[in-house]
Amino acid sequence: GLEYGISLEAALGALGITLKEVPDWNCCGASAGHMTNTTLTRALNVRNLALAEAAGMSEFLAPCPLCAKELALAHHEVKEHPDLLAQAQDAAEMAYRCTSRPITLVELLHRNRDLVRERAAGKLPDLKVACYYGCLHTRPREVMTFDDTEQPTTMDEVCQILGLQTVEWTHKTECCGAGFTMSKPGMVARLTGRILEAASRAGAEAFVVACPMCHANLDMRQGEAAADAGLGEEFQMPVLYLAQALGLALGLEPPALSLGTHFVDTTDLVARLQGQQPVAAAASEIEQEK
């Protein structure tokens, strides 16, 4: 997720959006929290909501979809149930008036798509990409309401503004296996392999994602996932964060967006996105000249 944080801050800064960190924020509890102790997880998230509220933030950016979901769910639960609010406030030792809510990066950019259009419209070539939302960007539908649960389009619309060609495909909201990547890597390889196969079948040349867990599984586990799906040892499909695509469209250089740290090499993809000749093609031409 380090690439995500670096590229997000750089891209939003280039877009003219300044980030201010919620003071003294804490972990949302992640998968371990909501699987083992919902009371603790709710209290952890109410504390973050209360901190954002105290800082005067009616809305705040939660770049990780899992964090955004946990925050939105806690907000929804305590707003609807005063007893849960009292319980969470006691545990967090903070008052919360239910006036602050999280938004994701996709929601932020889609809401500000006129600004994106003004600064970065058509700056990238019409490379075919699969926008992969993962299982949490639009779920549960009761709290993640900014897009359609099964057929979201907001990330596609932002990518299209940048000039990318988004493909229609079947697995844009299927789960990649998330945190099971450490305890059940075989299962993650199967799930991720199905996603790779579906994107490849739709003609995609790269993924665009906005979730660090999805990125990790598609990028880090791609070799074994491709093998599981029967795609062959040579299969490679680069995985870009939405923030990295935006940063390139805004003219930022690859190092500023941490594009050199992926498991699946992004060199040729970035060259194409910058309107340059891919490295492999250039090397082939040099060999022919010899």
Where in this protein do the model-derived segments appear?
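Iron-sulfur cluster-binding electron-transfer modules in prokaryotic oxidoreductases
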Residues: 1-290
